[in-house]
């Protein structure tokens, strides 16, 4: 029977899922405390103390990583190399900016400022140089150019 209603239908292209799930490693309470103290509870983008719940952010976006990093096995220097602290709002801003970059391979200017301390606006296999990747390093490098 035909109902006369027009509807959009999606065609299943494959029985196997295309999305490959990457397991995330949970951060223990002790490791979280260690990381928060290491970064002095300061937001990487502003340097200000975080009064709300700080979020431990992977510098390299989750969508670009092959596998998660087990932070419980890292030295303090390695933790600083792979992670930064952000407020929830800043983490959401970063997530959106990195999502646009992932789609277009064009780096979104950090907080509207078109400055990259390594590379330029074109993503070339690394996030290094982008303010969204490392807010502290980005501010330090920009300050050198201003002085």
Predicted regions and their residues:
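Short cysteine-rich loop/turn motifs with clustered Cys
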Residues: 27-60, 87-89
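Cys/His-coordinated zinc-binding microdomains
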Residues: 47-49, 91, 102, 128-131
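Short microdomains enriched in Cys/His and/or Lys/Arg
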Residues: 63-79, 107-125
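Cys/His/Pro-rich metal-binding microdomains
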Residues: 44, 88, 99, 125-128
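Short Cys/His-centered divalent metal-binding micro-motifs
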Residues: 77-110
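Histidine-centered nuclease catalytic patch
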Residues: 47-84, 99
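A boundary/linker detector
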Residues: 1-31, 124-147
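Short cysteine/histidine-rich zinc-coordinating motifs and their immediately flanking basic loops
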Residues: 53-61, 97-104, 110-114, 138-143
């Amino acid at each position: 029977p035909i109902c006369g209603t027009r509807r959009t239908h999606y065609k299943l292209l494959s029985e196997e899922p295309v999305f490959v799930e990457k397991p995330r490693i949970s951060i223990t309470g002790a490791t979280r405390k260690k990381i928060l103290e290491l970064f002095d509870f300061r937001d990487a983008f502003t340097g200000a103390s975080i009064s709300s719940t700080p979020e431990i952010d992977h510098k390299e976006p989750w969508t670009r990583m092959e596998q998660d990093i087990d932070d419980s096995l890292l030295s303090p220097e390695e933790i600083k190399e792979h992670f930064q602290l952000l407020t929830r709002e800043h983490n959401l801003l970063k997530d959106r900016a990195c999502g646009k970059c992932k789609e277009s391979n064009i780096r979104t200017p950090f907080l509207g400022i078109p400055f990259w301390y390594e590379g330029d606006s074109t993503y070339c296999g690394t996030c290094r140089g982008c303010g969204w990747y490392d807010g502290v390093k980005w501010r330090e490098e920009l300050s050198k150019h201003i002085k």
